[in-house]
Amino acid sequence: MSKYAWYTRVTDTLHRLTVLTLVGGTLYMSGGLAYTLYMNGKKYEQQVTQQKALEEDNQQLQSPTAPPTE
């Protein structure tokens, strides 16, 4: 069995490290993006829910209630 030349091994190692770095970085960034989108969606949903509740409260306060009829 023949051995590879030292420069072939070095080139192969550098190539593997480059590919692993690119794949790992891509997965890391994709995970961070997914997390950020999820958290922003939750925050937006809470904000909209609170805003609707405030609008309903304001409508109830502004609408005059009819006096009870006997």
UniProtKB/Swiss-Prot annotation:
Protein topology in the membrane: Single-pass membrane protein
Record InterPro entries: COX14
Keywords, sorted A to Z: Membrane, Mitochondrion, Transmembrane, Transmembrane helix
One cellular-component annotation, GO: mitochondrion
Protein name: Cytochrome c oxidase assembly protein COX14
Region (Disordered): 49-70
Main location: mitochondrion
Organism listed in the record: Saccharomyces cerevisiae (strain ATCC 204508 / S288c)
Domain of life (superkingdom): Eukaryota
Gene, per the UniProt record: COX14
Summary of the function given for this chain in its UniProt record: Required for the synthesis of yeast cytochrome oxidase.
Residues that span the membrane, as ranges: 17-38
Location within or outside the cell: Mitochondrion membrane
Note: Present with 6840 molecules/cell in log phase SD medium.
GO biological process: mitochondrial cytochrome c oxidase assembly; negative regulation of mitochondrial translation; protein stabilization
Name of one Pfam family that matches: COX14
